[in-house]
Design a protein with these regions (language model features):
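Short amphipathic alpha-helical segments
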Residues: 38-41, 155, 312, 335
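Catalytic-core regions of glycoside hydrolase
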Residues: 29-32, 105-318, 324-328
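Feature activates predominantly on carbohydrate-active enzymes
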Residues: 1-121, 125, 129-138, 168
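Charged/polar interaction segments and conserved charged motifs
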Residues: 62-63, 73-95, 109-127, 157, ...
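Catalytic domains of carbohydrate-active enzymes that cleave complex glycans
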Residues: 273-518
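Hydrophobic transmembrane alpha-helix bundles
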Residues: 41, 45, 93-104, 130-137, ...
Length: 518
C-alpha cells in the first residue's frame, strides 16, 4: 500500500521501493531516466517475484491519490513497467474513483454521467498507448472515506462497469474490492456487510470485473473464519486478498509465519474457485526488504502458494529456510521449522485466542487495547464492540439468536457455528457470547481456558527465544548479522506477548471476577 510520498500504509520495512522522484522525465514529459540504485532495486524485486511465479504488481495504495492518473505519473509508471516486463510482471494501478473531478476535468464522478465515462475512456486510451500491456485498475470505493459510486446513489456494479468498459478494448481488468462497511448497511454487524452489499449485484458486473475479497469477513485478524462472500457470489469471478504485511500479527517485530493461516483458508475456499490471489506486500527499502528476517518467508510463501496451493506450509518453510541460511543440518532446520510452523498459533494465543478479535490499539494496531473506545470514532473501530465482555461472559453473539452472521454460511458450517456445543473452539468467541464458567472440551471453564491460551502463547515465544539464543548461532556461519537481528527481535516479541497476556487478562478479570491462572 505504497503512497506517492514514499510512505507505506501498514508498511514495516522502511519506505517504498518505488521512488518516483528518482524517475526523471524528458522535456516533453515523456521518455525518462531512472537512477541506477532504483533500477537495480527494481530488477532485484522483479527477479524475486518472477522466481515465485508472481505475475503482477499494483504499484500504489488502494487509498489512492488522484495524481496517479496524471500524465506525469503514467509516464513514470511506463519506466517501471519496462523494467518489470522482461520478468513476466504486468503493472496495475489503484485509482481514486473521483479522479476526473479531483483533477478538475468534471464537476462530478457519477459513473452514469457521460462526461465522466468519456474521461475514463480517454484516460484508458492514454494509459494503453503508453503501456500496451497494462493490467488494469484496483478500486477501493465507498469504504473508509474513499469516494465511490454510492456518493451518487449508484451501485458498485455501476461504478465497476463504467471502468470495465473503458479498459475492455485493451484487455484490461477491474479488481473491485468488497471491503465495504459503514455505508449502505451502517449499523449491521460489520462482518455481514460485504455479503449484504454485493450479493444482490452478483451477475450484474461486466465480464472483465473481478471481485476482490479479504480471506476473512473482518480485517486480516490473527484468526477469522473464512469470508462467506466466497460462497454467496456465484457468477462474478473472485480474487482472494491476503495480507503479507503483518498489520495485526506483530508487524515486523514478531516472527509469525503466515502460510499455516493461508492453508487454513484454502481448506474452506478451494483455490480452483478463484481466478487469482492478491497479497498486501510486506516489502520496503530496508536492506533485508521485509524488516524482520523471517518476514521474508511470508513473501516467499505467498508466491509459492499462489503458484501451487497444494504445497504444504511445512514444505514451503523448509524450502525457504535451507535456501536462505544455506544449512540443511536437521539440528538447525527441524527446530527452526517448528518455530515457524507453530508461530501463527502462538500469536493467536498470546493476542486473541478462542475467537477473540479486533482488540488491538487504535491507529497503529500494535499491542493490546481491550478497553478501547473513542466516542468520535465509528463504533466498529472500537475493541469493546467486538468482545462485548460483561459480568456474564465474553464474545460476540453472531448465532441465529444474535446478528445471524452464521446465516451467511452454507451447511454444514451454518449449523456447526450456530450451536455453541459444536462450534469449533478456535471460533467460539467470534460466534457466541459465552459464560465465564462455561465448560470447555478440556473440562476447564472458559476463564481457565482463556488464561491457559494466553500463557501457552507466551511460553512458545520463550521457547523460540531460548533456542535461537543458545543454539541457532552455531549453524549460521556467514549469517551472524541475521542471527543477531532475529535474536534481538525475539526479545521484543516476548515482551509484547507478555504485554498482550497481562493487559487482556487483567482487563477481562474485571468482568469475570476470577483468579488469573499462571
Amino acid at each position: 500500500w505504497d503512497n506517492l510520498d514514499g510512505s507505506i500504509e501498514r508498511g514495516y520495512a522502511g519506505k517504498s521501493i518505488f521512488k518516483w522522484e528518482e524517475i526523471k522525465l524528458g522535456k516533453n514529459g515523456k521518455g525518462g531516466s531512472i537512477s541506477k540504485s532504483l533500477h537495480d532495486r527494481l530488477i532485484t524485486y522483479a527477479r524475486a517475484n518472477a522466481s515465485l511465479g508472481i505475475n503482477g504488481s499494483v504499484l500504489n495504495n488502494v487509498n489512492a491519490s488522484p495524481k496517479m492518473m496524471t500524465a506525469e505519473y503514467i509516464n513514470k509508471v511506463k519506466v517501471i513497467a519496462n523494467i518489470l516486463r522482461p520478468y513476466g510482471i504486468r503493472v496495475y494501478l489503484s485509482i481514486n474513483f473521483a479522479s476526473p473531478m479531483a483533477l478538475g476535468y468534471t464537476k462530478t464522478a457519477d459513473p452514469l454521467d457521460k462526461k465522466v465515462q468519456q474521461w475514463w475512456k480517454k484516460k484508458a486510451k492514454e494509459i494503453y498507448a503508453t503501456i500496451p500491456d497494462f493490467g488494469g485498475f484496483l478500486v477501493k470505493a465507498n469504504s473508509e472515506g474513499q469516494p465511490g459510486p454510492g456518493d451518487y446513489h449508484r451501485t458498485h456494479a455501476d461504478g465497476a462497469n463504467m471502468l470495465a468498459d473503458a479498459v475492455k478494448p485493451y484487455g484490461g481488468i477491474i479488481m473491485w474490492r468488497s471491503f465495504v462497511y459503514g455505508a449502505n448497511h451502517k449499523g449491521e454487524d460489520r462482518v455481514k456487510q460485504a455479503v449484504s452489499e454485493f450479493k444482490g449485484m452478483d451477475g450484474k458486473f461486466r465480464d472483465n470485473v473481478i471481485l476482490q475479497s479479504k480471506n476473512g469477513p473482518l480485517d486480516f485478524q490473527p484468526r477469522e473464519p473464512y469470508a462467506p462472500i466466497f460462497d454467496n457470489i456465484k457468477q462474478t469471478p473472485q480474487i482472494a486478498e491476503l495480507q503479507i504485511t503483518q498489520e495485526y500479527l506483530g508487524q515486523s517485530k514478531h516472527l509469525t509465519y503466515l502460510a499455516p493461516m493461508w492453508k487454513e483458508f484454502f481448506g474452506f475456499v478451494n483455490p480452483d474457485r478463484l481466478v487469482g490471489i492478491s497479497g498486501v506486500a510486506n516489502i520496503g527499502d530496508d536492506a533485508n526488504w521485509c524488516g524482520h528476517p523471517f518476514s521474508q518467508a511470508n513473501w516467499y510463501a505467498f508466491g509459492r502458494l499462489a503458484w501451487n496451493p497444494s504445497l504444504t506450509a511445512e514444505e514451503i518453510a523448509h524450502e525457504w529456510l535451507v535456501q536462505t541460511y544455506e544449512n540443511q543440518d536437521e539440528k538447525f532446520t527441524k527446530p527452526v521449522e517448528m518455530m515457524m510452523m507453530t508461530s501463527r498459533e502462538a500469536c493467536v494465543n498470546y493476542m486473541m485466542p478462542l475467537g477473540l478479535h479486533h482488540i488491538f490499539k487504535f491507529d497503529h494496531h500494535y499491542g493490546p487495547e481491550p478497553d478501547g473506545f473513542i466516542a468520535s470514532y465509528p463504533l466498529e473501530w472500537c475493541p469493546i464492540y467486538y468482545h462485548k465482555a460483561d459480568a456474564q461472559g465474553v464474545g460476540f453473539d453472531r448465532s441465529s439468536k444474535g446478528t445471524d452472521a452464521v446465516g451467511q454460511y452454507p451447511e454444514p458450517y451454518r449449523s456447526l457455528y450456530d450451536n455453541i456445543a459444536t462450534c469449533p473452539e478456535e471460533y467460539l468467541l467470534w460466534f457466541h457470547h459465552v459464560a465465564w464458567d462455561y465448560k470447555m472440551k478440556s473440562g476447564s471453564t472458559l476463564w481457565q481456558e482463556l488464561c491457559m491460551k494466553y500463557n501457552m502463547g507466551v511460553a512458545m515465544v520463550e521457547v523460540y527465544r531460548d533456542f535461537w539464543h543458545t543454539s541457532a548461532k552455531q549453524y549460521m556461519k556467514g549469517h551472524e548479522q541475521e542471527w543477531q537481528h532475529t535474536d534481538s527481535l525475539l526479545n521484543v516479541q516476548l515482551e509484547n506477548a507478555k504485554e498482550w497476556r497481562n493487559t487482556c487478562l487483567k482487563y477481562f478479570q474485571t468482568f469475570s471476577k476470577m483468579k488469573v491462572y499462571e
